[in-house]
């Protein structure tokens, strides 16, 4: 069923860009600036849209790729003078949230999981192994307050 708006020659078009999955520099099925660039460009240019909608369902991932994608969206929105609306489905955490804040407005379901940027950082601890091998951590700084740790050595 078509919606008709009186006095408009053409019904406004809203481009929809689905951003679903993990954000990472490479790999199939992952969001990154290189693979998304043509789709983002198309969303802002094809058919002269009145707005762009981002449908986001991402737990996040690479901070660099999140920044590049968000910057591309914001740059095109500003250049084309188009509003951007983010609609969060299940999750927009960490880098997914970063993508959402590139929009002018964010819409979420009460059941959506919304997370902060930098929620999780994972790594491996090998301090005991390193001590057994005779290795120790050394940090050198040249200014009094450069390092936040009182255990660090000052030069």
Write out the residue ranges for each language-model feature.
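Structural motif
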Residues: 14-18, 35, 51-55, 87, ...
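Conserved small/polar residues in nucleotide/adenosyl-binding loops
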Residues: 142-150
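Glycine-rich beta-to-alpha active-site loop
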Residues: 58-60, 76-124, 130
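Hydrophobic alpha-helical segments that mediate membrane insertion or helix-helix packing
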Residues: 54, 99-100, 146
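A short, well-ordered alpha-helical element
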Residues: 27-50
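Extended, non-globular alpha-helical segments
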Residues: 53-76
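Intrinsically disordered, low-complexity segments enriched in small/flexible residues
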Residues: 1-19, 123, 151
């Amino acid at each position: 069923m078509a919606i008709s708006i009186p006095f408009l020659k053409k019904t406004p078009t809203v481009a929809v860009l689905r951003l679903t999955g993990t954000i990472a520099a490479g790999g199939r099925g992952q969001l990154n600036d290189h693979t998304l660039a043509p789709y983002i460009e198309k969303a802002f240019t094809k058919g002269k849209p009145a707005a762009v909608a981002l449908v986001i369902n991402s737990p996040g991932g690479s901070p660099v790729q999140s920044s590049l994608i968000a910057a591309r969206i914001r740059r095109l929105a500003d250049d084309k003078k188009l509003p951007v609306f983010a609609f969060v489905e299940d999750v927009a955490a960490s880098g997914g949230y970063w993508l959402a804040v590139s929009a002018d407005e964010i819409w979420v379901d009460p059941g959506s999981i919304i997370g902060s940027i930098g929620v999780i950082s994972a790594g491996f601890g090998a301090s005991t192994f390193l001590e057994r091998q005779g290795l120790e951590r050394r940090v050198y700084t040249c200014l009094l307050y450069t390092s936040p740790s009182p255990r660090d050595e000052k030069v």
